[in-house]
C-alpha cells in the first residue's frame, strides 16, 4: 500500500512495516487500513487523511511561548516569524549533544545587529503534535543571557500551516494520506 507521510513523502508499506517517520501499517481491510502513529491506532479509508495539529495561546505580551522538543529534548521556545531559522544558543546545543562549531559558519542580522552563528540540521523538531525531521537551525555562541528561549523560526514554520485568531495560533500539517 502506498501512503503519503508528512504531506510529502510517498512510502510503500506492507502490514507490519514501519516508515522512518514512525508510521506503522498494522493491517489492510479492503478499502481501509489501520495505522499506528505515536502508539495510537488510527483507521483510515482510502483517500482519507489525518492532520497533526497544535493549538498555542499568546502570553500577556502577545508572544506564543511553548515547550517544544528538539532532537527529542524538551526546551522552552517562542514562535518567531521574523527569524529565518530555528535559533538556539550554545547551552541549548550542549543539551542536544550538538557540536555546533562543526556546522557552517554564517553571519546573521538580528534586531541587535550582526552575530556569528553556525548552521546545523536538527534531526527533529516537535511543537505539540506537529513534528518535522531535518530542520535547519542556527546556533549562537553564548548562553541564555543572549538567547534565553529557542526561536521557532521560518525553517520550521514555512513547512506547516499557521493560522492565528485573536490570542490563539494553530499549527498543523498533514500527517498521513
Placement of each model-derived feature along the sequence:
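Pepsin/retropepsin-fold aspartyl endopeptidases
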Residues: 1-177
Amino acid at each position: 500500500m502506498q501512503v503519503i507521510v508528512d504531506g510529502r513523502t510517498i512510502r510503500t508499506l506492507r502490514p507490519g512495516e514501519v516508515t522512518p517517520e514512525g508510521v506503522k501499517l498494522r493491517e489492510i481491510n479492503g478499502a481501509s487500513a489501520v495505522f499506528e502513529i505515536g502508539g495510537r491506532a488510527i483507521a483510515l479509508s482510502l483517500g482519507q487523511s489525518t492532520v497533526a495539529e497544535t493549538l498555542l495561546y499568546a502570553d500577556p505580551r502577545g508572544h506564543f511561548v511553548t515547550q517544544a522538543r528538539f532532537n527529542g529534548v524538551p526546551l522552552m521556545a517562542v514562535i518567531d516569524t521574523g527569524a529565518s531559522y530555528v535559533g538556539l544558543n550554545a547551552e541549548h546545543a550542549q543539551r542536544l549533544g550538538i557540536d555546533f562549531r562543526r556546522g557552517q559558519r554564517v553571519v546573521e542580522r538580528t534586531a541587535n545587529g550582526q552575530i556569528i552563528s553556525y548552521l546545523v540540521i536538527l534531526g527533529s523538531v516537535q511543537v505539540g503534535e506537529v513534528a518535522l525531521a531535518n530542520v535547519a537551525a542556527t546556533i549562537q555562541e553564548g548562553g541564555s543571557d543572549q538567547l534565553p528561549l529557542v526561536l521557532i523560526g521560518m525553517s520550521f514554520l514555512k513547512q506547516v500551516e499557521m493560522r492565528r485568531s485573536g490570542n490563539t495560533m494553530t499549527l498543523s500539517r498533514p500527517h498521513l494520506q
